[in-house]
């Protein structure tokens, strides 16, 4: 499972290696097809504002946008994937400046906020949403379980624990939608400059 992290934000305090490890951890825990590829992009506020206005119709920078790439791709894990082409699951776009502000307001670390936002963005790519109360409860529950398992494993060997915690949701909980990528703080794109399709956040 390939995760590509591109830091175009100018932020020097982003632990890109840890962010990639977290993303792989979440994808593995959610039983995502190992041939899927994910792009995580970190952008400056102006770039995020442009995406936010263009794809969400809202002013100002946001914290995270998710852009699913291939709606026809089966993201679920399978034993027989040899004949499947490698396919891009989508892009998660993060804004470190906004994340840093939110971390201060929440009273936790910048790394913790980025982990939360990246996990949130990936769940949107997998069809989770929080437009309705029941969806929000399910998405927040899975998100919390994944982050707790990541914290316990420190990104090392805890994928089994996360997988167990998220099993019910990964198989289709209330928080998932048939269409991948609604609002939550995500969008869809091939890159920060030119993402294709409508985002979720």
Swiss-Prot record:
This is Endoribonuclease YbeY. It comes from the Bacteria. Residues 151-201 are annotated as: Disordered. Residues 173-186 have a biased composition (Basic and acidic residues). GO terms for biological process: rRNA processing. Binds 1 zinc ion. Its EC number is 3.1.-.-. Belongs to the endoribonuclease YbeY family. Gene3D superfamilies: Metalloproteases ('zincins'), catalytic domain. The keyword Membrane does not apply.
């Amino acid at each position: 499972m390939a995760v590509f992290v591109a830091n175009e934000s100018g932020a020097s305090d982003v632990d890109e290696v840890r962010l990639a490890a977290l993303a792989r951890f979440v994808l593995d825990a959610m039983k995502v097809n190992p041939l899927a590829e994910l792009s995580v992009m970190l952008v400056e506020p102006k770039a995020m504002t442009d995406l936010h206005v263009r794809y969400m119709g809202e002013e100002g920078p946001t914290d995270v946008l998710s852009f699913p790439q291939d709606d026809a791709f089966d993201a679920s894990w399978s034993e027989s994937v040899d004949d499947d082409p490698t396919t891009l699951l989508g892009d998660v776009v993060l804004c470190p400046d906004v994340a840093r502000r939110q971390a201060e307001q929440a009273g936790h670390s910048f790394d913790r906020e980025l982990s939360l936002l990246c996990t949130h963005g990936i769940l949107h790519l997998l069809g989770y949403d929080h437009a309705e109360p029941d969806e929000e409860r399910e998405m927040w529950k899975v998100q919390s379980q994944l982050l707790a398992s990541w914290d316990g494993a420190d990104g090392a060997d805890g994928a089994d624990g996360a997988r167990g915690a998220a099993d019910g949701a990964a198989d289709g909980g209330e928080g998932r939608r048939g269409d991948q990528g609604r609002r939550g703080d995500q969008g869809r794109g091939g890159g920060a400059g030119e993402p294709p399709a409508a985002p979720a956040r």
